Amino acid sequence: MFGEWLPAAPRERSLIGASVGSWRFASACLPDAAEGIRRLGHLYTEQNFAKGVTMAQISQSSRRMLDDLLDGRDAALLDNAHYRLNIMVVKSHGLLADDHRGRLGLGLSSVIADNLRGRARLSRHFERVIIHDPRLAPPVNTLNDFPSRFVALNAGNLRQALLASGSIPMVMEGVRDLPGAGAGTFRDGGLLDYHLDLPYSGDDIVLYPHFTDRVIPGWFDKTLPWRRACPARLQNVLLLAPSREYLSRLPYGKLPDRNDFKRFMGDAPSRQKYWRAAMDESRRLGDEFLELAANGRLGERLLTL
């Protein structure tokens, strides 16, 4: 998509993501978008963690991976001619601002309980922060579901913003005092906006390459089948998702995910083989998309979201 399809119709485009989505879009903003995304896949696949790995060790490994990915090309990423990067993070309140496992665990328990009572109650625990390319405002209307604010993205906060956006509690340390966003502890933006159920602005199509055909509002909603995205916010969303038939052909019948590090603990070569096989299959999926688009047949696959 970023290697051929979008460059064939160049224009200013907003890229907005949380967690690994922000890393993927940052990779697409590098001078060679396709190579940047391939590089991210390679670097992540090569990660390996021993049993008992600490949050500090995973954070350090993530910093090294980000260094290898950007390779000193921060300015080129920020100056991309066509893409405007938006990185979503949350500022954590109370016990969630602490990386001590006991206190953080208590804080997460409170979040889970409040989320069951109502998603709006998460405003007690998190503030949404969108760190965006200052050349273009974030592609959203007024955000009034949670306390929210915008921060300009620049060379001084790019790497910290990306690290914060991927900082899952109990897995990685939070990022302290994010430049431009003030004092505090900043974490994975997916905690609030897991699948970006946002009030998108304008009349353009929102193209959403996704790993599932369901839009789940927040990270804590994953086990709540009744918690669904707002239909009004999806009116202009075109979601691209792998079919169940495609997933069934993958090794283990699923896409690779973070839990594979535990599933293959002590056997990194098997996990890496599995992930590489899945990436090879994804390239074939991309070829099929390009063929459908070139032949005007995308409409044959459209379903109501």
State each model region's role:
Residues 1-14, 27-305:
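Patatin-like phospholipase
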Residues 19:
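Catalytic nucleophile serine of serine hydrolases
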